[in-house]
Amino acid sequence: MRKVLITGGSSGLGKRIAQIWSQKGHQCHIVGRNEFHLKETLQSLSVAKGQQHTLTIADVQSDMKNLKSIFESVEIDTVVHAAGVLQSSLCVRTSEKEIDSIICTNLVSAIKLSKMAILEWFRNKNSERDRLILNISSRLSTYALPGTSVYAASKAGLESFTKVLAAEVASKGIRVNAISPGYVDTPMLSSQIRAIAEKKVPIGRLASTDEIVDACTFLLDNRYTTGTILPITGGL
C-alpha cells in the first residue's frame, strides 16, 4: 500500500487520481482549498483494503505548514502535485495578481513541496519504500496557444525542474516524473479553450481523466522510470 499526498485533490485530475488509486489499495491524503469538495472526494474513496484516507484544507500558495503536518503524521512515499491555476487571457491583459497566482501555484509550490518531501525522506533514509514525486504538467508547456503564455511558462519550468531534480536525487532512491497531458475534460477547462481543443486535437476529442490517470499509474508502478515527462496528447 502506498501512502500518497495529492494536492488539488478536491476536483478534476487530482480527485480522479485519488479515486482510482484508492481502488487499487493505496491510501490517499488529499489537499485542497474547498472543504465541501474535499469531503465529497474523501467520501468517494475506496477503503476496501483498510486505508485511512485524510483531507487537509490548505492553499498550496501559502499553507506549507499544513502540508508539513501530513508528513509528520503519515509516512508519505508518493507526492502528486495536481494543484493548478489556468490562464485564459493574453499576457498584457493578465493582472500581476493573476501572474503571481499562476506561477506560485503551478511551479513554486511544487518546488517547495518537493523539497519538503525529500528532506523528510532523507530523515527516514532507512525506509525501503519506493519514493516518487509526480508533477502534473501540460502540453501547453511547449505548444504556443495565445492566451496561455504565463501558464505555459509555469509548466515549462515545472518540466525542467522535474528533470533536474530527478538527476539530483536518483542515487537516493527517489524518483521524479511528470505527465504532460493535452486537453483533458475537467472543470478547469474554459469553454473557449474547450472549443479550440476539439478542433485542434488530431484524435478529435478531449482526453478523459481516466486516460490521464492510466499514465500516472504507469509512472507510479514502473520503478525504473525517473526524469521522464510522459506526453498524453491525442497527437497534439
From Swiss-Prot:
Keyword NADP belongs to the record: yes
Entry's localization field: Mitochondrion
Molecular function GO labels: 3-oxoacyl-[acyl-carrier-protein] reductase (NADPH) activity; oxidoreductase activity, acting on the CH-OH group of donors, NAD or NADP as acceptor; quinone binding
E.C. code: 1.1.1.100
Active site: 137 (proton donor), 151 (proton acceptor), 155 (lowers pka of active site tyr)
PROSITE patterns: ADH_SHORT (PS00061)
Cellular component per GO, a single term: mitochondrion
Keywords assigned: Fatty acid biosynthesis, Fatty acid metabolism, Lipid biosynthesis, Lipid metabolism, Mitochondrion, NADP, Oxidoreductase
Entry-linked Pfam families: adh_short_C2
Signal peptide span: none
Chain sites annotated for binding NADP(+): 13, 34, 115, 151, 155, 184, 186
Family statement drawn from the similarity comment of this UniProt entry: Belongs to the short-chain dehydrogenases/reductases (SDR) family.
Protein name: 3-oxoacyl-[acyl-carrier-protein] reductase
Gene, per the UniProt record: oar2
